[in-house]
From Swiss-Prot:
Its EC number is 2.4.1.109. This is Dolichyl-phosphate-mannose--protein mannosyltransferase 5. It comes from Candida albicans (strain SC5314 / ATCC MYA-2876) (Yeast). Glycans are attached at N409. The keyword Calcium does not apply. Disruption phenotype: Shows altered cell wall composition with a significant decrease in wall mannoproteins, and reduced virulence in a mouse model of hematogenously disseminated candidiasis (HDC) and using reconstituted human epithelium (RHE). One of its GO terms (cellular component) is plasma membrane. The gene is PMT5.
Length: 725
């Protein structure tokens, strides 16, 4: 007797095979669900409660406000994140009339009375409400109505999500577009292929992906999530014997267009608008090459020649940072003046290139003598009056025998001394060089060279290693014998000399295309992101996040408040009940999905005879995508060496809460009583945790005793002294 095949299976030539078909059907909203949506909307409005508190700059709001100011000034800047969020906030402010010359410098500064900070926070809050509603519509695709409502309310009451959606930050909009991606992709998988609704959800998913990767660099994780799920789905389509190769190609091409081409088009368009709004030099100029900067309206062209006596700035070719010195000294070793790399244009980056003989100002300023390959020179630091110097002492960080400390020492009047002399070895030229002359004579922005110390025969170099706090966390500069060549390469970015005022001899650049700008900007973004290694009091490790070991002090007016101002503290902290539920359910899901996958590895295993899928199978089919989403949005942080903070866990937490919904739905399907008890326990616990921490979520009044009693974990460094005033 032939065994009855379950729904979705057909008999192939040798074995049953699973067909590709929508596994779920969309159901219309019932009256109960319509009432639930209305109720959820009302509950989510609590995110907008007293948005005006505090009327001061909170945490990373300072960065967004400065970027808005840069847009008004047209001053170019560089950030680790793509510019969509900053552009949205900027265009919102353009709807209002206020003094564009506002000055906001640090966290805690009062917002000017006419600055529309409340409207900017309102936008973030509306994104938070949209995130809540989209979560409900996502959940009802695979969960029963009650579980969908419960989990959606958990999103409403998740303290960390509430906090970020009340402030001028990127996290609120980012969570909204991430939820837009998740909902539309899930809806897309339930549609009949090539219908109107199928096309709609397909392309809205692509648009949402474009917005997501244009808001935050972490949007790439969600992009990867869609990519993985799409590959799995295409594999299933390929295995369906009823689908022709041409239909498969159609599926493939449409997904490539929607999930790759559409997002990348949006992404590039956002950067184009970004560049158009920043035509002038600005705080980001120091990170950019002269070729890029030559496209800016107020870029000052530099003399092409470099003469002895020229005041120059020297940049590291790989790191794009300035050779720099200042009055600070090394705390050990020579105890002489520090030499470092610095990110920004500064007077302390200026050096005078001199001959190796005793300084003769009249000769240097009147003789037009060019610096050539093989010349031996000295570099005089204008701001501090000392010469670049190497001595036989180990550097403060790289304490190897083949390494030497680089410092500033001696002043004008110095006689010939090899410890202060460097041979210029010209190696290659920049791509924008017009001829081979930069390989013979030192040319501004064109010649890439090494500086070889005459006494020790070591190469002046720098690397990504940074000095501690006594060195202002600037990059270490040292001298090394036989180093890696890229670390030893330098170029002259700017040059000035009294004899070089002929405008016909200024350096001109060929056209720098939009794509070249885009590539260079991303190199800078990558280096900036990698360079966030300076110690921070509220940095944490990814392993601390799921168990909420510590939070982040977003704001305290302890030292800021006026006489009639109430104490206010915002401490970024998640909902303990939700975080722990997500953590333990994640462990359970990993175990269950691993077991189920192992059982299903045999392609010749007979499918279950029941025409109705078991709760276990439903749990696996609906939970593994969210488990993958949590994994992709969390694990990469464990591999990063940069500073990380609890708010980096938000995207993973969002997937974790969706995973929690599948587990509760599974428990209720298995046993309504046990499932109901687990669901009710988590729900009530989450409400309790939210209520207990409302004051530090919203910045509302509290007391010292109440604050101290809410330090549930030893690492929760909540500044309760805020409430003593």
């Amino acid at each position: 007797m032939t065994k009855e095949l379950p729904s979705g299976y057909f008999q192939g030539p040798f074995r049953p095979y699973k067909t590709f078909q929508p596994s779920l059907t969309e159901r219309p909203l019932s009256k109960f669900e319509q009432f639930a949506v209305f109720s959820i909307l009302l509950i989510s409005l609590i995110r907008l409660y007293k948005l005006y508190i505090p009327d001061r700059v909170v945490f990373d709001e300072i960065h967004l406000i400065k970027y808005i100011k840069n847009y008004y000034d047209g001053s170019i800047f560089v950030d680790i994140h793509p510019p969509l969020g900053k552009l949205i906030y900027f265009y919102i402010t353009k709807l209002f009339s206020f003094d564009k010359d506002f000055q906001i410098d640090i966290i805690g500064d009062l917002y000017p009375e006419d600055f529309p900070y409340l409207w900017l926070r309102l936008f973030s809050g509306i994104c938070g409400i949209g995130h809540v509603l989209l979560t409900f519509f996502t959940l009802r695709i695979t969960c029963n109505s009650v579980i969908s409502i419960v989990i959606t309310i958990l999103i409403c009451l998740e303290n960390s999500m509430v906090t970020v959606s009340r402030l001028i930050l990127l996290e609120g909009p980012s969570l909204f577009v991430q939820s837009l991606v998740i909902y539309n992709y899930k809806a897309f998988t339930t549609r009949i292929p090539f219908t109107g609704c199928w096309y709609f959800n397909l392309f809205v998913t692509g648009i949402a992906l474009g917005l997501n990767i244009s808001l935050k660099i972490s949007g790439l994780f969600t992009f990867a999530w869609v990519g993985i799920l799409t590959c799995v789905q295409l594999w299933e389509i390929l295995g369906d014997l009823r689908i022709s190769i041409w239909q498969f190609i159609k599926h493939l091409v449409l997904r490539v267009v929607a999930f790759i081409m559409v997002p990348l088009t949006i992404y590039c368009s956002v950067f184009y608008i970004h560049f158009e709004n920043l035509p002038n030099e600005g705080p980001g100029s120091g990170f950019l090459t002269p070729h890029f900067r030559s496209t800016l309206d107020d870029y000052q062209q530099q003399p092409l020649q470099v003469l002895y006596g020229s005041t120059i700035t020297i940049k590291h070719n790989a790191l794009e940072k300035y050779l720099h010195s200042h009055d600070l000294t090394y705390p050990r070793g020579s105890n002489l003046q520090q030499v470092t790399l610095y990110d920004f244009p500064d007077v302390n980056n200026e050096w005078v290139i001199e001959t190796k003989q005793k300084y003769n100002e009249e000769k240097l300023m009147t003789d037009q003598r060019e610096v050539k390959d093989g010349d031996v020179v000295r570099l005089y630091h204008k701001a501090t009056g000392h010469y670049l110097h190497v001595n036989d002492i180990r550097p403060p960080i790289s304490e190897h025998e083949y390494s030497y400390e680089v410092n500033g020492n001696e002043t004008r009047g110095l006689l010939g001394n090899e410890d202060y002399e460097f041979k210029i070895r010209m190696l290659v030229k920049k791509p924008h060089a017009e001829n081979d002359l930069p390989l013979i004579k030192l040319r501004t922005t064109e010649t890439i060279f090494q500086l070889i110390h005459q006494a020790t025969r070591c190469n002046l170099m720098s690397h990504e290693q940074k000095l501690p706090d006594w060195g202002e966390y600037q990059n270490e500069v040292l001298c090394v014998k036989e180093p890696t060549i890229p670390n030893t390469l330098w170029y002259v970015e700017s040059s000035s000399h009294p004899l070089l005022k002929d405008t016909k001899k200024l350096k001109t650049f060929p056209k720098f295309s939009f794509w070249s700008k885009l590539i260079e900007t991303h190199k800078v973004m990558f280096n900036l992101n990698k360079g966030f290694t300076n110690p921070h009091p509220y940095a944490s490790k990814p392993l601390d996040w799921p168990l909420l070991s510590r939070g982040i002090a977003f704001f305290s007016n302890y030292n800021l408040k006026s006489i009639d101002e109430e104490s206010s503290l915002i401490y970024y902290l998640g909902n303990v009940a939700i975080y722990y539920s997500v953590f333990f359910v994640g462990l359970i899901a990993i175990f269950k999905c691993a077991i189920y996958s192992f059982i299903k590895l045999n392609p010749y295993a007979s499918p279950p005879s029941s025409s109705k899928s078991s709760p276990y199978a439903n749990f696996y089919n609906n939970s593994w995508p969210y488990l993958v989403g949590w994994f992709i949005n969390y694990i990469p942080y464990c591999l990063m060496s940069r500073n990380l903070y609890l708010h980096h866990y938000l995207s993973a937490l969002n997937f974790g809460i969706l995973l929690l919904s599948q587990y509760l739905n599974y428990r209720v399907a298995k046993n309504k009583i046990i499932g109901g008890i687990i669901t009710a326990t988590i729900f009530v616990s989450a409400i309790y945790c939210f209520y207990e921490f409302i004051p530090i979520t919203y910045g509302l009044p509290w007391t010292l005793d109440q604050c101290n009693s809410h330090k549930w974990f030893p690492n929760w460094d909540i500044d309760c002294m805020t409430y003593t005033g």
